[in-house]
Amino acid sequence: MFLAASREYERNAILGPIERNMTVAIAQAFRKQGKAFLGRFQDLADKLPGILTESEWIELLELAQLETRDLFVNTATEGATLAMVAGIRRTADDLGLPETVLGGAKTWTALLTVAGLRKLLRGGAGAGGPPGLFGALAGAAEMPPVAVVLGIQFGLQNPRAVDYISRVGAALVTKIDETTRDYIRTVITTGVREGQSYNEIAKAITSRYSEFAVGRPQLHIDSRAHLIAVTEVGQAYSEGNHIVGETLRDAGLKMEKRWLVMGDERTCPVCMGNEGVDWIPFDQMFPSGHMRPLAHPACRCDLLMQAVT
């Protein structure tokens, strides 16, 4: 129990600010998308109340989604990058193996701020490199490592990290867009079926987008924007953990892993079952079929690893 509480505190200390910043940015993106859609949806006002086919409004929504796509992609990419670096640092520190880190920081706790992580990433592009986080990503191949364990470099130049970061933004936007279409379809279909006016349907659409930004879908989740942030940051953090294990395994070390739950009333039976098997071989799936956390959206579980001598 102490281990879980300690890990949760440390995890929240570094991921909490990333999640909050990402939540705010995603909420703003939802608001802008809602405004962009309603601006186009107004062209259909003369048809309401009345029959409105999906093809008439879906194209307008897709245009609004395209207009705001970069807001979601850039936010997801930055949040995932910061969380992945934190995950790599956390695991390198966990394993208790020799490491060197940019800027002379010797433990992951030296980076317990979003600003610290951004400074780490931006500093890697070199004096002549492009500025900002995405400049650092563009120069990832030339970046010093985030950590070096037993002579093995870990950081954004790692092929597994590059692959994950390069696709996370687009993959997330695809899921967000699909879910948004389902929500808006329900709002419009219900409105048309009930003979609502344009103003009534537009108000319902506005309300739905507002809920995306500030609603409360779960007890410990404030909104859809928060749910997305918590899930994507957690996934990237866990992927950073896993990348260290994969690379050490490929280098010839025998690795084991363990699923760690937070152990409170919010812990689900699936995650409890994963923790119940204790330490397992690194390449073995947990009972849920996952190789690592997260088992579900908003999952708060952590991954422990150890080298077997």
What are the residue ranges of the model-derived segments?
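Acidic, glycine-rich two-metal-ion catalytic cores of nucleic acid-processing enzymes
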Residues: 218-309
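N-terminal leader/targeting and assembly helices and adjacent pre-domain segments
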Residues: 1-215, 307-309
